[in-house]
């Protein structure tokens, strides 16, 4: 087990990325912390899983609702917009190995 030893990198207004490949021997995956009242979750080249920790609201122009403990499987190259009633806190992870 390795505790995160780095602060992460802010890649957008709502997303902080934790890429262990920069400081660790772990090179299998990247984790992103998503926060905010509204915003966009950028597409990545890999399928991903996102877990909502807090907040509720709508995604994809109101087509999908979210609330704490929801788990979403996201296809590669999928951009998600969100509008939260209270601040969203979610984590997305994806493997960078093919």
Per-segment meaning from a language model:
Residues 36, 71, 94-98:
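Extended recognition/assembly regions associated with phosphoester-bond processing machinery
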Residues 1-38:
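C-terminal amphipathic alpha-helical segment
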Residues 50-51, 71-73, 88-89:
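C-terminal functional regions that serve as terminal interaction/effector modules
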Residues 28-30, 45-46, 68:
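A generic structural signal for well-ordered coil/turn residues at beta-strand boundaries
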Residues 34, 58-81:
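Short acidic-glycine-tyrosine-enriched beta hairpin
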Residues 31, 57-59, 90:
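Generic structural motif
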Residues 65, 76-98:
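Ligand-binding loop in jelly-roll beta-barrel domains
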Residues 36-62:
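Glycine- and acidic-residue-biased ligand/ion/polar-headgroup-sensing regions
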């Amino acid at each position: 087990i390795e505790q995160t030893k780095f602060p992460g990198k802010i890649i957008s207004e709502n997303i902080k990325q934790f890429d262990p490949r920069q400081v660790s021997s772990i090179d299998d995956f990247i984790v992103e912390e998503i926060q905010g009242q509204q915003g966009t979750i950028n597409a990545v080249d890999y399928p991903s899983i996102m877990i909502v920790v807090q907040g509720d609201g709508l995604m994809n122009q109101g087509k999908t609702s979210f609330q704490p403990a929801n788990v979403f499987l996201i296809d590669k190259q999928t951009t998600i917009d969100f509008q939260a009633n209270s601040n969203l806190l979610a984590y997305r992870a994806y493997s960078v190995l093919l």
